[in-house]
Regions:
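ALDH superfamily catalytic-core signature
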Residues: 193, 198, 220, 226, ...
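Hydrophobic face of alpha-helices
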Residues: 47-50, 69-76, 84, 88, ...
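Hydrophobic face of amphipathic alpha-helices that form TPR/SEL1-like repeat modules
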Residues: 1-35
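Residue-level signal for inorganic ion chemistry
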Residues: 32, 53, 68, 91, ...
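Short linear capping/connector segments at secondary-structure termini
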Residues: 90-97, 130-134, 329-335
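Rossmann-like NAD(P) dinucleotide-binding subdomain of oxidoreductase/dehydrogenase enzymes
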Residues: 121-278, 480
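Glycine-rich loop-to-alpha-helix module at the N-terminal edge of alpha/beta enzyme cores
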Residues: 31-125, 411, 415-423
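Conserved C-terminal structural/oligomerization subdomain of aldehyde/semialdehyde dehydrogenase
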Residues: 29-37, 55, 61-66, 70-72, ...
């Protein structure tokens, strides 16, 4: 696949359309290598895509659920077999994932999303009124939304691109899918797998393009019904505001459903009773898997002074072992960051740290973009708990540690550490506590109940599994609608209660009138 350069078209009006405006996706491990070229949607293309999707909506939503489900179940089978390695390769080359990370994303998680969503939908449709009065039949209909769904997917998970577009479509909606420019190759392959599985071509419109231009046309349309988004907090807040302004103007036929999962400044909180080896190894994995480019990645760790020397030693030793290089070479744990802008942001943070007296570099601190965008895993110890590295999301392989003093009053120190965890960051996505003392676990679980939508005990802050740990957070991290659960599907249906009476009413008066 490294020697092939696919051309990715728009997918509008049952045709693949090539436009005069094009972009390229490069291999982040070798930024001189073009992985894919793609057409960019113009404002008129977006309008055409909306019209095509809405024209396809009546037939698609009227299909029996079993027929819609069959499409996505077949797609899951195609991904599990025929296209597994192609999709993994596109993810490895285009998004910089090693084989393990590509497998658990582009294969396993994507397949799980497609299959579990069918099960969740069946369970949702089965939720019917618990009681019928004599002579009355009550039922609930789960209607697709009136209009279309706008799905904006990120670069870092092929599975998310699939879920953002496929989940609403499964429920009978039509979708305009804007993929990340940095995941075009894998997302285009996935789109074509859905078509091969039997998805009507106009149900999901594949529209790469300038984000602001595409979004402007979509949010201006009166039949915009929902946003399904994963990406940065800043962009989500902007979109939320634009949609709110549209609601205030009376622009939309209904109130759009807004579903978003954004950033995180995820924590590991270590208690003095923790298994030090486990806590250190889990922290390395949580921070540096996929170069820290997961919204759930561990980026801050709080360690008690009583075990800091042992923890630091093991942490640094493990980080030093990590191999950095091309993701298709099996020895490498760390691959490239996704693009030049990310590299610039991360290398800038490393450069700034060199002059920062409140930071001590423990390991790493190097980078190289001569061929690919490589940033070596880096760990700092901060002398102050309010350092900006504890609150600024960098989205890369940089971890910051703070050592809290537990030598005088361990219980009070752990409580204060919980307060730090909760108050330092605006996010609320994921976090972990490491302790063998059950009282400490229980204390942290309660104290940090709003600090993380996914809370882990004695395991890393990453790795939510569909059907096991529904994923999402609140505060600045999103709407917490929980991908990988039945809850997310409720956001893409509109319930209608239907009451039918079998017996005629014969008089106006109440029994009390007699």
């Amino acid at each position: 696949m490294r020697d092939e350069v696919p051309s990715c078209s728009l997918a509008i009006l049952t045709a693949q359309i090539k436009t005069s405006s094009t972009g390229v996706q490069v291999n982040p491990s070798d930024h001189n290598t073009v992985l894919a070229t793609y057409s960019q949607a113009s404002p008129q293309d977006v309008k055409t895509a909306i019209d095509a999707a809405l024209a396809a909506k009546p037939e698609w939503e009227s299909l029996p659920f079993a027929d819609r489900a069959a499409v996505f179940l077949k797609a899951a089978d195609l991904i599990s077999g025929k296209y597994r390695y192609d999709l993994m390769a596109a993810t490895m080359l285009g998004q910089g994932k090693n084989a393990w990370q590509a497998e658990i994303d582009a294969a396993a998680e994507l397949i799980d999303f497609l299959r579990f969503n069918v099960q969740f939908a069946e369970e949702l449709y089965a939720q019917q009124p618990a009681h019928n009065s004599p002579g009355v039949w009550n039922r609930t209909e789960y209607r697709p939304l009136e209009g279309f769904v706008y799905a904006i997917s990120p670069f870092n998970f092929t599975a998310i691109g699939g879920n953002l577009s496929a989940a609403p479509a499964l429920m009978g909606n039509v979708v305009l899918w804007k993929p990340s420019d940095f995941a075009i190759a894998s997302n285009w392959l996935l789109y074509n797998i859905l078509l091969e599985a039997g998805l009507p071509k106009n149900v999901i419109q594949f529209i790469p393009g300038n984000p602001e231009e595409v979004t402007r046309e979509i949010l201006a349309h009166p039949q915009f019904a929902s946003l399904h988004y994963t990406g940065s907090t800043a962009v989500f807040r902007k979109l939320y505001g634009q949609i709110g302004a549209g609601v205030a103007e009376g622009r939309y036929r209904s109130y759009p459903r807004i579903v978003g999962e954004t950033g995180g400044k995820n924590f590991h909180l270590i208690h003095a009773s923790a298994d030090i080896e486990n806590a250190a190894i889990q922290t390395v994995r949580g921070a540096f898997e996929y170069q820290g480019q997961k919204c759930s990645a561990t980026s801050r760790v709080y360690v008690p002074a009583s075990i800091w020397p042992q923890f630091k030693s093991r942490l640094v030793d493990e980080v030093k072992k990590l191999q950095v290089g091309n993701p298709w070479e099996s020895k490498n744990f760390i691959g490239p960051v996704i693009h030049a802008a990310s590299f610039k942001k991360l290398s800038g943070a490393i450069d700034a740290a060199k002059e920062d007296k409140d930071l001590e570099l423990l390991v790493g601190g190097t980078y190289d973009d001569s061929k690919g965008y490589f940033v070596h895993p880096t760990v700092y110890e901060a002398k102050t708990p309010d350092h900006k590295l504890f609150s600024t999301e960098l989205f890369g392989p940089i971890l910051t540690a703070y050592v809290y003093d537990d030598t005088k009053d361990p219980v009070a120190a752990f409580s204060s550490a919980c307060d730090l965890v909760d108050s330092t960051s605006e996010y609320g996505l994921t976090g972990s506590v490491f302790a063998s003392d059950r009282a400490a676990v229980r204390f942290a679980e309660e104290k940090l109940r709003n600090s993380a939508g996914n809370f882990y005990i004695n395991c890393k802050s990453t790795g939510a599994v569909v059907g096991q740990q529904p994923f999402g957070g609140s505060r600045a991290s999103g709407t917490n609608d929980k991908a990988g659960s039945i809850n997310i599907l409720t956001r893409f249906v509109s319930m209608r209660s239907i009451k039918e009476e079998f017996n005629a009413t014969t008089k106006v008066e109440y029994p009390s009138n007699e």
